[in-house]
UniProtKB/Swiss-Prot annotation:
Keywords: 4Fe-4S, Amino-acid biosynthesis, Cysteine biosynthesis, Heme, Iron, Iron-sulfur, Metal-binding, NADP, Oxidoreductase. It is an enzyme of class 1 (oxidoreductase). [4Fe-4S] cluster binds at residues 438, 444, 483, 487. This is Sulfite reductase [NADPH] hemoprotein beta-component. Siroheme binds at residue 487.
């Protein structure tokens, strides 16, 4: 289409010489399409680390270099390098995992990791504590079941999410297939991954190696998700690009509302950074998914800020250019969007226990606290995997669904859940069932405080407060991270906690119950006593002053406890 866009400032985007942009842009451009010197670094047995630039490039391969931060000082005193190890993330569109793949992933975690698996808030697996010499065998093991880690991290399209709601089995299957199609389309095309990890020989070609991404890929990560109302389990408003399924009168997917510009990360004491909820800009039919996805990503690729990585996410491009300009830019590439169609969300939580989908199948959602599966849990779930004829689904809330259990097979699965004790995992408080935490310490290099290891104990103490006020059955969303980057999406929780220092957190209140509204900072840099004292006061008021069926986040705004956040850019006011 002819370019009819009004002029815009392009002083920080891909049109500029590399020397004017972030050093990461030169790194990508000079990496030979993500090859770098990764293959050579893997052969170096003198160090358990990889060379500096390759650390960043390996993220595009789904790999993060980390170290055990709790023994870092001691190793320094002993004149030893840090205890380096790697986190490896699988690409798993829609969180769908066959039983064969589950068993292989469990095997690899025990053989090459620390005998645990982490299910993430983006419906995939992470291996932790993988040593450098074990990366290749682990990745080749994944390849045996046709899984990989391509673009699970890095400046590209991350894993594509999709609703896990078996109440609409045909729609869910269609949505999962569309998510897989989009995921396959936006994955980087370079053969670097196959050459480095599978030993594939490089073959010269006259075709462009990255026809969409080019040499410098995206300015920052780009997240895509699909959702079927009324359950906003994937937190559609936290996605860079979200597709909200609209169901037609015939009961099939008529198309999608398009939501753009969501994102959770911020930096403390940096008011130019903030979380943002996505804006709905229109409606498209299913046949336009690929062209619109390319258009949206292409606008961010071409106009995103590549000079300042703290402002490189799509949310900032939208706010800098203006939503109307961005929509024009998308339509200039993909054609006009129709007006958005009505939809309604009621919750972003999982539905635990058995659900019958009406097509002869049953589905059991199992609570996995903070997504962490230890060796005992892996062994118990393996017993189910060996007999289960359906598949597994990883939920966006870090839980596990045993999906597509035939009526005739349900008694056997139920018996195994009881014999192994797994079924008791669901016997938790409503607050705990609605909680999430990121990994944080001791491995995440960005964490400033504990999260996964600390939240369970903190919840136990908050449960006492809820019981005191007879609120133990109230669904309240609580999310914690070890830093403000927001991996567990804390900025749309009714209660959000983000780490500031060991034992210290920022406390946020006022998020929307189904993820539709950002929360706001209420108390800054406080420890556990102040957290509990503050929540005791606010929950006490909620118990006595709330309206019928009023959610906690809504109450804190109506009662004047916290000011509503209407736009992310105003959340730091």
């Amino acid at each position: 289409m002819a370019n009819t866009l009004p002029p815009t400032d392009r002083s920080c985007d891909i049109s500029q010489p590399l020397e004017r942009l972030s050093p990461d842009e030169s790194l990508k451009a000079e990496s030979d399409y993500l090859r770098g010197t990764i293959a050579l670094g893997l052969l170096d047995r003198i160090t358990s680390a990889v060379p500096g630039n390759d650390i960043k490039l390996m993220k595009f391969h789904g790999i993060y270099e980390q170290d055990d931060r709790e023994i870092r000082d001691e190793r320094r005193r002993q004149k030893l390098e840090p205890a380096f190890q790697f986190m490896i993330r699988v690409r798993l569109p829609g969180g769908i995992c066959t039983t064969e793949r589950w068993l292989k992933i469990s095997e690899l975690a025990c053989a090459h990791g620390n005998e645990t698996l982490r299910m993430t808030t983006r419906q995939t697996f992470q291996f932790h504590w993988v040593l450098k010499q074990n990366i290749v065998p682990l990745i080749r093991g994944l390849h045996e079941v046709l899984l990989d880690t391509v673009a699970a991290c890095g400046d590209d399209s991350r894993g594509v999410m999709a609703t896990v709601n078996p109440q609409f089995p045909a729609l869910q299957a269609e949505l999962a297939a569309l998510a897989k199609t989009v995921s396959d389309h936006v994955i980087p095309k370079t053969r670097a991954y196959h050459e480095i990890w599978y030993g594939e020989e490089r073959i010269a070609s006259s075709e462009p190696e990255e026809p969409f991404y080019g040499q410098t890929y995206m300015p920052r990560k780009f997240k895509i998700g699909f959702v079927i109302p009324p359950n906003n389990d994937i937190d559609i408003y936290a996605q860079d690009l979200g597709y909200i399924a609209i169901i037609g009168e015939n009961g099939k997917i008529a198309g999608f509302n398009v939501a753009i510009g969501g994102g959770m990360g911020r930096t403390d004491k940096a008011p130019h950074t903030y979380p943002r909820t996505a804006s709905v800009i229109g409606f498209i039919t299913p046949d336009r998914l690929i062209s619109v996805t390319e258009a949206v990503m292409g606008v961010q690729r071409d106009y995103g800020n590549r000079a300042d990585r703290s402002r490189a996410r799509f949310k900032y491009t939208i706010d800098d250019k203006g939503l109307d300009w961005i929509k024009l830019a998308i339509e200039d590439r993909a054609g006009p969007l129709e007006s958005a169609r009505p939809y309604d969300f009621t919750s972003n939580a999982d539905i635990y226990g058995w659900i019958e989908s009406g097509d002869g199948f049953h589905h059991f959602t199992l609570f996995i606290e903070n997504g962490r599966l230890n060796r005992d849990m892996l062994d118990k779930i393996a017993q189910i995997a060996h007999v289960h004829k359906g598949h597994f689904r990883l939920t966006p809330n870090q839980n596990l669904m045993i999906a597509n259990v035939a009526t005739a097979d349900k008694p056997e699965i139920e018996a195994l859940l009881r014999e192994t004790g797994l079924i008791a995992f669901n016997e938790r408080s409503v607050l705990r069932l609605n909680s999430m935490a990121c990994v944080a310490l001791p491995t995440c290099g960005l964490a400033m405080a504990d999260s996964e290891r600390y939240l369970p104990d903190l919840i136990t103490k908050i449960e006492g407060i809820l019981t005191r006020y007879n609120l133990q059955n109230e669904p309240i969303t609580l999310r914690m991270t070890g830093c403000p980057n927001g991996c567990s999406r804390p900025f749309i929780a009714e209660i959000g906690l983000t780490g500031r220092a060991p034992g210290k957190y920022n406390l946020y209140l006022g998020g929307g119950f189904h993820g539709q509204r950002l929360n706001r900072l209420y108390r800054e840099n406080i420890g556990e006593p102040a957290i509990l004292e503050t929540l005791n006061e606010v929950l006490g008021r909620y118990a006595t002053e709330r309206l019928p069926d009023e959610h906690f986040g809504d109450f804190t705004i109506r009662a004047g406890i916290i000011r509503e956040v209407t736009e992310g850019r105003f959340s730091n006011d």
